Every structure is written in C-alpha cells, then in structure tokens.
C-alpha cells in the first residue's frame, strides 16, 4: 500500500507540475507580448540568413563541380567559336554532363575575359604608337625651333650687311652704265658725222683753171660749225702748220696737194687736190688761203656759188 501511495503521489506531483509549465508557456502575458514577438522575428531572420548562406555555398559547390577535362573541352569549343547557339549549347551540355545553363554562363564569362584581354592588347599597341609619335613630334619641334633660329640669324646678317652690298652694287652699276654710254658715243660719232670713203673724190688733173668740184666737195666736208670749233680746239697748231706748208708748196710748184683735213673721230681723211696756173696766181691771195683753212672761222665760200662763172 505504501508503494502504491508513493507512486500515486509522484504521479500526482508530476501531473500537478505539467499543467503549470504548459500554462506558463501558453501565457505570453507573463513575459510581455511585444518582447516575445520581437524575439520570434529575430529568430526567423537568423534562420533565413543561414538558409541563404547555405544556398550560396551550394551554388559555389555547383560551380566547382566542373572538372579539368570539362574546362579544356569548353576552351576548345570557345576557340573555335566564341558565340554559343542554343543547339550547340544543348549538345555541349549533353556531352560534358552539364546543364545548358552552366554552359551558357561559362561562355558568357569567358567572352568577358577575352574582351578585357583584347582591350589590354589594343591599349598596349596604341600606347606604344602614341609614345613613338610623341617622341617624333618632340624631335620635329626641336628641329623646327633650331631652323627658325638659323633663319632669324641669317635675316639679321642680311639686314646688317645689306646696306654696304647695295651701295657696292649701285656703284658698280653706275660705272658700267657710264662705260657703256661712253663706248656708244665713241661708236656713234664716226657713224653719224663721218664715214671713211672708199676712194678719194675724183678731181680733174689737167685743167686751165680751178676745179669747181673740189670746192663743192670741200664745202661738204665742213658742214657744221660745231665740228669746226671742236676740230680747232683739238688740233689748232697742227692745222695751222699744215696750211702754211700748203701755201709754200703752191708758190714753188703748179700742182699742189693739200694736207689731210681731219674731222673729230679720227677715222676720216679728205685730200683736196688743187691745181693752179699762172693766170690765176692773183686769184687766191695769202689771206684768203689762210681764211679758207682757218680753224677759228667756218669757211664762207659764197663767191663760188654761181656755176656759170666757173664753167
């Protein structure tokens, strides 16, 4: 009996304790409703975070599932063609034992890496070209600056010594022009004034009186007063001696030859042949002969203008 009572007492005690615990758990008012709800919400959020972490780990584990052989096969297919078509995607997935989505993602990532590598290569090539062009540009600019400095120096030299050179050139030009003008005058004077005749004028050797033609030729020889004056200034003494010698020879002989009469220019000589007979000794006196060959006055031969008198 005692055992039964003890057992009943223990069971009763347990029964009495159980509802109390259940009532404590079921009565949230004892700890406050708001605090309990906040605790529950925090617990749920922690569980969701743990699930998400486990999901990420599972994805990473799925990514790591590609073997080395699968990667090599995908690389070969990528080298053949980097674009993936749907039929090809399914075929590769079946051959490699992967999902089509995994194959598509791998190709997408591989294309991105390939583009970045290509951009890096292109950037390196362009950078080298830019550096070379920059170097060439700098060298050309330095050369240009040096050439400009040389040009400025040459300009200063030309401007500094240009006056003396111009003066020398002007003086040389003036001297050459003067020499040319003098030569032209020397050449033009003999051509305009006198020309050397091919043969002396023809005179009548045998005649009883003075030859009219000799006087006309003599008149033509001295047409200009200026020529006579210049001739007198140049050779006055020589002509006077020639005229005196001519008069002396006339008195000694019947046939006389006059001294050469020179005209300015030095290239023309005219000989006048005169013949005088005894009947005309008084016709030409000494004064008239001197006046005829005089250098101071031009000849005035008005007395032989009538043709009938001499004929």
UniProtKB/Swiss-Prot annotation:
Q: Name one GO biological process term.
A: positive regulation of DNA-templated transcription
Q: In which tissues is it expressed?
A: Widely expressed.
Give the site residues for Interaction with ABI1.
67
Q: Which GO terms describe its molecular function?
A: DNA binding; DNA-binding transcription factor activity; DNA-binding transcription factor activity, RNA polymerase II-specific; sequence-specific DNA binding; transcription cis-regulatory region binding
Keyword annotations of the record: Abscisic acid signaling pathway, DNA-binding, Homeobox, Nucleus, Stress response, Transcription, Transcription regulation
The family database entries (InterPro entries) matched by this protein are listed as: HD, HDZip_class_I_plant, Homeobox_CS, Homeodomain-like_sf, HTH_motif, Leu_zip_homeo
Sorted alphabetically, the Gene Ontology cellular component annotations on this record are: nucleus
Q: What induces it?
A: By water deficit, by abscisic acid (ABA) and by salt stress. Self expression regulation.
As for PTM, the annotation reads:
Phosphorylated by PKA. Reversible inactivation of the binding to DNA by phosphorylation.
Q: Which family does the record claim for this protein?
A: Belongs to the HD-ZIP homeobox family. Class I subfamily.
**This protein is called what?**
Homeobox-leucine zipper protein ATHB-6
> Could you tell me which species this protein originates from?
Arabidopsis thaliana
Lineage of this protein's species?
A: Eukaryota, Viridiplantae, Streptophyta, Embryophyta, Tracheophyta
